[in-house]
C-alpha cells in the first residue's frame, strides 16, 4: 500500500452559536482556508485529486463541491461531502488517507465545516396537500430507531449513571478544559492551528467559547439540564461555527514537492455501540485500533478525544486507561467549541502541531452509537 502523510493543516477560530461568524454560510467559512492553501502551495492545489469534507447540519447538496468552486479552484476537481455526524471531519481525513493508500490518487484536501448559526430549519412534510395544520418543526435529527434514540443530553446522562461519573468530576474536567485552552492559546500552541481572517473589517483569530475567567464555583451553580441530572451547560460543549482543512498526500509525492515534515496515517477503526451510550464510542474504536497495530495505550504519546460532554470523556478515559497528562493536553471542545462536521478534522490538526509527540490518536463518539479513531505518527521526509 501507498503511505499517506498530512503535510499541512489549518483551521479558522471557532465562533460561538450566534457569535461573530453567525452571518457566514459554510462556504464562506472555508474560503479563507482554501485561499491560504492556494497562496502557500499553488503547485499542490493545481494537482488535487479530490476534496473530501465533513458536514452535518448544512443546506444539503454537495457542500464540498460548491465550496471549492466558490473558492475559485479548478472545476475539474470533483468534491464529495461526508455525513457521519460528529465524526464527519475525522471520517473525511480517514477516507482521504484510504484513497491514497489504495493508489486512487496522490493529493487530497480533507476537512470539515459547520455553521450551526446558519443551519436551516426543517419541517415535516404534510401527508396531504390539503392538510391545514401548522407545520411541525423537527427539534433534532433522529440518530437511531424509536425508543433507542436519546437526545445528546440524555445520552450523556446515561453514560454518567452507568459509569458513576459525578457532577463534581464533570465540572472539574470542564474547568481543566478551559484552563488548558486558555493557557495554550496564550502561549501560542493553539494559535499555530488558526488562520486569522477578517470578519467585518476586524481579524478573527481566537476561539469565542474559551472562558479563561471561569471558576469551579460558577460551574457548580449551574442547574442540571435534566431533572436530578449531572450534565449542565458548563460541563458540555457549545454549538459552534468553524472550518478545518488539511492536505493529505502520498509520501513519495510529498518528497518530490519538497515537503519534509508532517504526520503519517497508520490505521483507523470505526465501531458501533449502543445508541443509548453513544459517548463511549471511542472505547471500542481505540481498543480495536490498538489491537490491529499490536500496541497498548502506553505506546501512545497523545490522545485527542472530542469533548462533547465531560461525562463521556471521563468514562472513555477510565475504560481506556488513558493517563490524564496524555489526554487533550491543550484543552478540548468544552472550551474551544464543537462545530460538528469540522471537529474530527480539528483533532487531527491539533495532533499535526504537537510536534514533540511521536505516536498519536484522534477519536470521536458519534450520534447514533458509533466511535471512530485514527492513529498517526510523526513523519520526516528527508
From Swiss-Prot:
GO terms for biological process: fatty acid beta-oxidation; phenylacetate catabolic process. Gene3D superfamilies: 3.40.47.10. GO terms for cellular component: cytoplasm. It is an enzyme of class 2 (transferase). It comes from the Bacteria. The keyword Transferase applies. Keywords: Acyltransferase, Transferase. GO terms for molecular function: acetyl-CoA C-acyltransferase activity. Pfam families: Thiolase_C (PF02803), Thiolase_N (PF00108). The active site is at 86 (acyl-thioester intermediate), 338 (proton acceptor). Its EC number is 2.3.1.-. PANTHER family: 3-KETOACYL-COA THIOLASE, PEROXISOMAL, ACETYL-COA C-ACETYLTRANSFERASE YHFS-RELATED. Belongs to the thiolase-like superfamily. Thiolase family. This is Putative acetyl-CoA C-acetyltransferase VraB. It comes from Staphylococcus epidermidis (strain ATCC 12228 / FDA PCI 1200).
Amino acid at each position: 500500500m501507498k503511505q499517506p502523510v498530512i503535510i499541512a493543516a489549518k483551521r479558522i477560530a471557532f465562533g460561538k452559536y450566534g457569535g461573530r461568524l453567525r452571518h457566514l454560510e459554510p462556504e464562506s467559512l472555508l474560503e479563507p482556508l482554501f485561499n491560504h492553501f492556494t497562496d502557500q502551495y499553488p503547485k499542490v492545489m493545481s494537482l488535487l485529486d479530490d476534496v473530501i469534507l465533513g458536514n452535518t447540519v448544512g443546506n444539503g447538496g454537495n457542500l464540498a463541491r460548491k465550496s471549492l468552486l466558490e473558492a475559485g479552484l479548478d472545476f475539474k476537481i470533483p468534491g464529495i461531502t461526508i455525513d457521519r455526524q460528529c465524526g464527519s471531519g475525522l471520517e473525511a481525513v480517514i477516507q482521504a488517507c484510504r484513497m491514497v493508500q489504495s493508489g486512487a490518487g496522490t493529493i487530497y484536501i480533507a476537512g470539515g465545516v459547520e455553521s450551526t448559526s446558519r443551519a436551516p430549519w426543517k419541517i415535516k412534510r404534510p401527508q396531504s396537500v390539503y392538510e391545514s395544520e401548522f407545520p411541525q418543526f423537527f427539534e433534532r435529527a433522529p440518530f437511531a430507531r424509536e425508543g433507542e434514540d436519546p437526545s445528546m443530553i440524555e445520552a450523556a446522562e446515561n453514560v454518567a449513571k452507568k459509569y458513576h461519573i459525578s457532577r463534581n468530576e464533570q465540572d472539574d474536567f470542564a474547568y481543566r478544559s478551559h484552563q488548558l485552552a486558555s493557557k495554550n492559546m496564550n502561549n501560542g500552541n493553539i494559535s499555530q492551528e488558526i488562520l486569522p481572517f477578517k470578519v467585518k473589517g476586524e481579524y478573527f483569530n481566537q476561539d469565542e467559547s474559551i472562558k479563561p475567567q471561569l471558576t469551579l464555583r460558577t460551574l457548580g451553580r449551574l442547574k442540571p439540564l435534566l431533572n436530578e441530572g449531572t450534565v449542565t451547560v458548563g460541563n458540555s460543549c457549545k454549538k459552534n461555527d468553524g472550518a478545518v482543512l488539511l492536505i493529505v498526500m502520498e509520501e513519495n509525492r510529498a518528497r518530490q514537492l519538497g515537503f519534509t515534515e508532517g504526520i503519517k496515517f497508520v490505521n483507523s477503526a470505526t465501531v458501533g455501540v449502543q445508541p443509548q451510550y453513544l459517548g463511549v464510542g471511542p472505547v471500542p474504536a481505540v481498543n480495536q485500533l490498538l489491537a490491529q497495530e499490536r500496541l497498548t495505550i502506553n505506546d501512545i504519546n497523545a490522545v485527542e478525544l472530542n469533548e462533547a460532554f465531560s461525562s463521556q470523556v471521563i468514562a472513555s478515559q477510565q475504560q481506556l486507561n488513558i493517563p490524564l497528562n496524555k489526554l487533550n493536553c491543550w484543552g478540548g471542545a468544552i472550551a474551544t467549541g464543537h462545530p460538528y462536521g469540522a471537529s474530527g478534522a480539528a483533532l487531527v490538526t491539533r495532533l499535526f502541531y504537537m510536534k514533540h509527540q511521536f505516536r498519536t490518536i484522534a477519536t470521536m463518539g458519534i450520534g447514533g452509537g458509533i466511535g471512530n479513531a485514527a492513529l498517526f505518527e510523526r513523519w520526516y521526509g528527508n
